[in-house]
Amino acid sequence: MRASVVLTCYCWLLVRVSSIHPECRFHLEIQEEETKCAELLSSQTENQRACSGVWDNITCWRPADVGETVTVPCPKVFSNFYSRPGNISKNCTSDGWSETFPDFIDACGYNDPEDESKISFYILVKAIYTLGYSVSLMSLTTGSIIICLFRKLHCTRNYIHLNLFLSFMLRAISVLVKDSVLYSSSGLLRCHDQPASWVGCKLSLVFFQYCIMANFYWLLVEGLYLHTLLVAILPPSRCFLAYLLIGWGIPSVCIGAWTATRLSLEDTGCWDTNDHSIPWWVIRMPILISIVVNFALFISIVRILLQKLTSPDVGGNDQSQYKRLAKSTLLLIPLFGVHYMVFAAFPIGISSTYQILFELCVGSFQGLVVAVLYCFLNSEVQCELKRRWRGLCLTQAGSRDYRLHSWSMSRNGSESALQIHRGSRTQSFLQSETSVI
């Protein structure tokens, strides 16, 4: 019963990224802790103590003398399910180790009534972000097709939008594929075969991390493009290659460095744990830099727009242009920058519940917001769609009129031919009657 509760909780733990079955990962972590315990006990000299060091399948106990009480924290492998910090103990007696006390479930808080609500919360969050990524993927795909179909929409601005769309689509696909593998219940578990599939598991995680980082950097490219457009340092079209290098190149370099540090420093499991700080910061620092730079660009863009909109030198046409620019972009940059900045600057003081809601629920609908702002509400896109719709309507109307005209001409021709035929028969009859007379 105790193991089933823990495994159920583990299956719905959403903050981890994995590509193997959760139960297999659970057993793997138990094996890793057992190996560490064996190494620790082998390095210690027992000095003929009454109670030798032992691994009791969940916790490592050091050697002790009779009458000594050994106290250890709750097992590390269950740390994701602690409702409160706790300790468990054992006494060393003349007959050996005593039973663990206090009760394992009571000491570590696994029977906390909040556990059921937490599991329900994780299930709800998973359902919400699955819906969000699915809707975002469909809307982004539709928006990309629209931009690609109309040649008048082919420009540097929309090329950048397409790359941003692609980064969001890849992010959604990587999350949905990861979840389909992680929460798949088809087939029998063969955990002893899982280590042979670590390569595919690690590759899936590398792809996932790359999509996340590329998405952040294409949001940064959008901010850079808008800032360049406002300050007019260089023509935006001349910077497109640099934008490509920033959006796809920098994440490639960073993920390559992260892979190298993982292989050399923490090549364990599916690379979804962060026990070593160096690989964690190798992948986290570039994302933090993009968030901070994008937030600084947002502040600068707001300042420039306010100056231009309040300037008396700005004419009516220019002012309306800046207003359109502000409507289509200023709603986007705060949405992608401000809440990320909050969690980047204050990661400790904010509840993990709110962070999960923002990162998973709100973040999953970002692709939908991007598609709406940069495609469906874009005046150029709407004009092209209306023009194409009018063209289709006119084509159908013309085809219908042509069919009606052809049918009318055919009918008139048939009636004329019938009248001529009748007249010729009458004339022939009269001629025959006359000849008889």
UniProtKB/Swiss-Prot annotation:
It is found in: Cell membrane. It comes from the Eukaryota. Expressed at high levels in the MIN6 cells, at moderate levels in pancreatic islets, insulin-secreting cells, lung, brain, stomach, and colon, and at low levels in the heart. SUPFAM superfamilies: Family A G protein-coupled receptor-like, Hormone receptor domain. The chain crosses the membrane at residues 124-149, 158-179, 203-227, 239-260, 280-303, 325-345, 354-377. PROSITE patterns: G_PROTEIN_RECEP_F2_1, G_PROTEIN_RECEP_F2_2, G_PROTEIN_RECEP_F2_3, G_PROTEIN_RECEP_F2_4. GO terms for biological process: adenylate cyclase-activating G protein-coupled receptor signaling pathway; cell surface receptor signaling pathway. Residues 150-157, 228-238, 304-324, 378-437 are cytoplasmic. GO terms for cellular component: plasma membrane. Keywords: Cell membrane, Disulfide bond, G-protein coupled receptor, Glycoprotein, Membrane, Receptor, Signal, Transducer, Transmembrane, Transmembrane helix. G protein-coupled receptor activated by the neuropeptides vasoactive intestinal peptide (VIP) and pituitary adenylate cyclase-activating polypeptide (ADCYAP1/PACAP). Binds VIP and both PACAP27 and PACAP38 bioactive peptides with the order of ligand affinity of VIP = PACAP38 > PACAP27. Ligand binding causes a conformation change that triggers signaling via guanine nucleotide-binding proteins (G proteins) and modulates the activity of downstream effectors. Activates cAMP-dependent pathway. May be coupled to phospholipase C. Interacts with ADCYAP1/PACAP (via N-terminal extracellular domain); activated by PACAP27 and CAPAC38 neuropeptides. Interacts with VIP; the interaction results in VIPR1 activation. Belongs to the G-protein coupled receptor 2 family. This is Vasoactive intestinal polypeptide receptor 2. It comes from Mus musculus.
